[in-house]
């Protein structure tokens, strides 16, 4: 019998991703990107809960079950409200007792 996983609600996933982003961004983003993010976030910033992609294995080298993870993007929106400048993509496990996360940072 498979264990039923209680999925993260979007607001919780967004909060987790944003907290981790703020803590780790200085070590993983260029200073110019951090400055851009800080200057533009209030006007154009977004933290979005998106459908979990099934190609994370290409990014992290491990196959994952998209049903067991939430995906959150942090970036800036353009004038069409599309996120065209993604600073980080987060993959966060739904398992509260063993929370894993992976991050793909802007290069």
UniProtKB/Swiss-Prot annotation:
Xref: InterPro entries: dsDNA_mimic_put, Put_dsDNA_mimic_sf
SUPFAM superfamilies, A to Z: Putative dsDNA mimic
Coiled coil start-end: none
A Pfam family that the UniProt record links to this protein: DUF440
Functional note: May act as a double-stranded DNA (dsDNA) mimic. Probably regulates the activity of a dsDNA-binding protein.
Entries under NCBIfam families matching the protein: PRK05094.1
Name of the protein in its database record: Putative double-stranded DNA mimic protein Asuc_1259
Organism: Actinobacillus succinogenes (strain ATCC 55618 / DSM 22257 / CCUG 43843 / 130Z)
